Amino acid sequence: MEQSIFPEGYESALNLHDTQIAIKTVKDFFQKHLAQNLNLARVSAPLFVLPESGLNDNLNGVERPVTFDIKNQADREAEIVHSLAKWKRYALKKYGFSVGEGLYTDMSAIRRDEIVDNVHSIYVDQWDWEKIISREDRNMETLKDTVRTVYKVLRKTEKYLSIHYDYIQEILPGDIFFVTTSELEEMFPDYTPKEREYYIAKAKGAVCIMQIGGRLGNGEPHDGRAPDYDDWALNADIIVYYPVLDIALELSSMGIRVDRKALLEQLEAAGCPERAELPFHKAVIDETVPFTIGGGIGQSRICMFFLRKAHIGEVQCSLWPDDVMEEAKKSGLQLL
């Protein structure tokens, strides 16, 4: 999406007060069952990190983090996190987790360069989770099994809400459809990556698109991915069709994390081999951090989806352009 959409005739089924109650209902139920099914413990997480640590998520490599100096630390500069993709792997070691165990956090981030629309905001809130796996488990089956587990929790949450709210009907299919970006390119060669996502999501209802970041047959990647956390051969997005807006809606991005080989190859491909000298990257290369799988699940995204809202601003507090605020008001959307 490149601009906000205000569906004709849309009216929220819940007022502002009831929306707040419903948001808590969604979050409490989902995170409880996610933690149980993936064997995750909740931990405290940082809002900011030091740039020189290499722990921040560089996203596509062009987004600017919000930075500030710290007065009583000789004006040392810190930056607000974009996500905790790399920090979590470091934390699993520091906190003494074992193979088969994992952690999750309530992650808040500011992405100042985000192009905002119905599903994108400069404020990002997600469950960031990470789990230790063995070297032998770094394979496609582990990825798919974990995707199925996350998807099962999504379906269970939708069923729970459909019982509590009469207006919510179950729309998620029984199974999620798996496809790689290369297969998707073969299926829809004349379409853009976003168009491919839309058509496959609308056809299947729920889709797991795998292997994101590397170049496809046309010489371009399906989508941008930082080279230093996901293994581009072993990652995935969970995308569902969202009829309220007639869009493909990404609910989660996840993947098996880079090992030494994947990290060095991807840093080279991304044109930033110098990052290998950063502390986190050295730890991956030296294998002093565990092998892991992890991801992020958008809290506002799933609240928007399950509560059938037309704009993410209906379920989170953020700042929006004046024209969006004006159009929302005219359309009867109540942005928080």
Predicted regions mapped to residue ranges:
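Extended, charged alpha-beta segments that form solvent-exposed binding/catalytic grooves
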Residues: 105-195
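Generic recognition of stable, solvent-exposed alpha-helical segments in well-folded globular domains
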Residues: 21, 25, 29, 138-145, ...
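A general structural signal for short secondary-structure junctions and capping/turn motifs
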Residues: 68-71, 93-99, 119-121, 169, ...
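Extracellular structured ligand-interaction cores
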Residues: 101-103, 124-128, 204-206, 246-248
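Class II aminoacyl-tRNA synthetase-like tRNA-binding/catalytic domains
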Residues: 2-120, 128-132
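A glycine-rich phosphate-binding loop feature that marks nucleotide/adenosyl-phosphate handling sites
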Residues: 47-51, 166-173, 321-325
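A generic secondary-structure signal for well-formed alpha-helical elements
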Residues: 34-41, 150-161, 310
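A translation/RNA-centric and nucleic-acid-associated enzymatic feature enriched
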Residues: 108-110, 180-336
